[in-house]
């Protein structure tokens, strides 16, 4: 068994685009819970990453792209499998939030953001495959994950389904304008 962090990426894309659930919800939730449990590491000191270890290393934490919780890891790992990518961390975190697992999602975000504290890494440049690489823009899904704010331009409907209790204010951006909700 392999725990791939992006195993239900298409389901996340369908959710943030308003398509709705495509896969069985229980299986999606089970997958994301397993990824949170097995792939999120608070300390990578004992983790060997022979590829590009500067994304996360030493006592830093991160969400590993792939794990083998029941054994069976390849002797020669496939490319990138041992890495931490902010774009995948944000994707998994926002998907967890969209499914009501807000604390688990926030735990991933905090672990990720702790690496970009301005001492070792630029907090405004979550580099993965070059500076200002676009995958980290999946962080935009965190707004929807927490606030449930999504605008459907086809039907001209603003959806607001907050996952946090109490009043809040959120950023909103559409093709024709932006503001706060």
Model-assigned labels for residue ranges:
Residues 1-85, 117-118, 173:
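Extended glycan-interaction surfaces of carbohydrate-active proteins
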Residues 56-59, 78, 89-181:
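Non-catalytic C-terminal accessory modules of carbohydrate-active enzymes
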């Amino acid at each position: 068994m392999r725990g791939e962090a992006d195993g239900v990426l298409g389901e996340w894309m369908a959710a943030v685009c308003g398509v709705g659930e495509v896969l069985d919800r229980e299986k999606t939730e089970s997958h994301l819970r397993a990824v949170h449990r097995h792939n999120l590491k608070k300390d990578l000191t004992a983790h060997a990453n022979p590829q590009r270890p500067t994304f996360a290393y030493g006592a830093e934490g991160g969400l590993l792209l792939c794990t083998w919780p029941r054994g069976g890891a390849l002797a020669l790992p496939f490319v990138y499998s041992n890495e931490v990518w902010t774009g995948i961390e944000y994707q998994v975190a926002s998907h967890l939030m969209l499914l009501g697992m807000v604390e688990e999602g926030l735990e991933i975000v905090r672990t990720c953001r702790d690496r970009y504290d301005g001492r070792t890494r630029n907090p405004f440049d979550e580099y993965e495959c070059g500076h200002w690489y676009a995958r980290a823009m999946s962080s935009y899904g965190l707004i929807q994950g927490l606030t449930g704010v999504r605008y459907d331009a086809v039907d001209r409907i603003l959806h607001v389904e907050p996952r946090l209790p109490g009043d809040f204010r959120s950023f909103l951006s559409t093709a024709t304008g932006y503001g706060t909700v």
